Amino acid sequence: MVQQYTRLNVADNTGAKKIMCINVLGGSRKLQAKVGDVIVAAVKKSSPDAQAKSGTVVKAVVVRITKPYARPDGSYIKFDDNAAVILNDKMEPKGTRIFGPVARELRDKKFTKILSLAPEVL
């Protein structure tokens, strides 16, 4: 689960490397984000020629979490790292490439563009 101050890797080619969660969107009671949830984050580390510079506040969707979570069919899945993809104002990915696998739950949340860019969907 991703909560405030959780640091995540960035799984796209916007140039940002690490982001830190500031807030989880979806109501005042929502404290933790799962796969497919949108968060507000601050870019903590980026490459010099990045689209998302260090210190900027961005929206991102969580695509991988390390905590095992159950699927409706009874299976569990977990990933090796916490990762997110940076979004633009239209809730589409800002980058043009996605690195690493992403979870199938993004299809339910209508992030089909991320699924089509991803090399592997688990």
From Swiss-Prot:
CDD domains noted in UniProt: Ribosomal_uL14
Ribonucleoprotein is among the record's keywords: yes
GO BP terms: translation
Origin superkingdom: Bacteria
GO cellular component: cytosolic large ribosomal subunit
Alphabetized UniProt keyword annotations: Ribonucleoprotein, Ribosomal protein, RNA-binding, rRNA-binding
UniProt keyword Glycosyltransferase present: no
Any one Gene Ontology molecular-function term assigned to this protein's record: large ribosomal subunit rRNA binding
Subunit structure: Part of the 50S ribosomal subunit. Forms a cluster with proteins L3 and L19. In the 70S ribosome, L14 and L19 interact and together make contacts with the 16S rRNA in bridges B5 and B8.
Function: Binds to 23S rRNA. Forms part of two intersubunit bridges in the 70S ribosome.
PANTHER family: 50S/60S RIBOSOMAL PROTEIN L14/L23, LARGE RIBOSOMAL SUBUNIT PROTEIN UL14M
HAMAP family, per database record: Ribosomal_uL14 (MF_01367)
Similarity-based family: Belongs to the universal ribosomal protein uL14 family.
Name of the protein described by the UniProt record: Large ribosomal subunit protein uL14
Organism: Dehalococcoides mccartyi (strain ATCC BAA-2266 / KCTC 15142 / 195)
Lineage: Bacteria, Bacillati, Chloroflexota, Dehalococcoidia, Dehalococcoidales
